[in-house]
């Protein structure tokens, strides 16, 4: 996880801040993961020329939410009825009441070569909050994103873009590991606190990815604290070795033992 602390009056679409966080996030990846295809997803705050150009310069794949301005509205309304394809959910199943269309006629002059605009149309579900969003005469709501991915399967591209909402899970996890309240009065001290929170979240993510399975691999920090970190244990020495003895009756003691075994089995450098 990477992040920077910004003043309260900072804009949501400040490209330089996005570029800085991007560089930090790429450096946080293991070297082996920095090669090949890397996809960067962002909401419409990332739809700035400077940020998208930086993604293009680095050779990264991108999927960025796009604001629906007047020209985009016209392009959406110009879409033919047979140009819409049923959308899919994250499991590849058809999603009722949702369709996808590529706005190939939208003028994207000024954006990097190969930039495409893809639109999602859906019927709001009954409990949806009413917002001042663009709708057509049938009440459909629309979302648009731009991408440089060449995959002709726009349904898969749209589902992949929508999956970026999992960042909300990381934000929630960060709040549970210290980000909910910045404890200091000074900006620099709170910036250091943010770095510690990012380290904590990074440890949680890699622990879940490499050492845990099942429910624990997707559990919230509070659950991990209770089931694993609160496990009663005792350090003993035997044969010049330090041994951690866990409470045998603790329901998740076996999961913790397995996590240690997986951790010790990892190569020295990943």
Predicted regions and their residues:
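Electropositive, glycine- and tryptophan-enriched low-complexity nucleic-acid-binding patches
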Residues: 1-33
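Glycine-rich, histidine-containing beta strand-loop boundary motifs that form or position
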Residues: 4-7, 42, 64-68
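Short, conserved catalytic/metal-binding motifs centered on acidic residues
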Residues: 38-47, 62, 145, 167-174, ...
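Short, conserved secondary-structure transition motifs
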Residues: 44-49, 67-76, 231
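Short, surface-exposed basic-aromatic patches at helix termini and helix-loop junctions that form
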Residues: 52-61
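An anionic, glycine-rich sequence signature occurring as long contiguous blocks
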Residues: 63-175, 258-270
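Short amphipathic alpha-helical "interface-anchor" segments enriched in bulky aromatics
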Residues: 154-207
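A short, flexible helix-boundary coil/loop motif
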Residues: 203-270
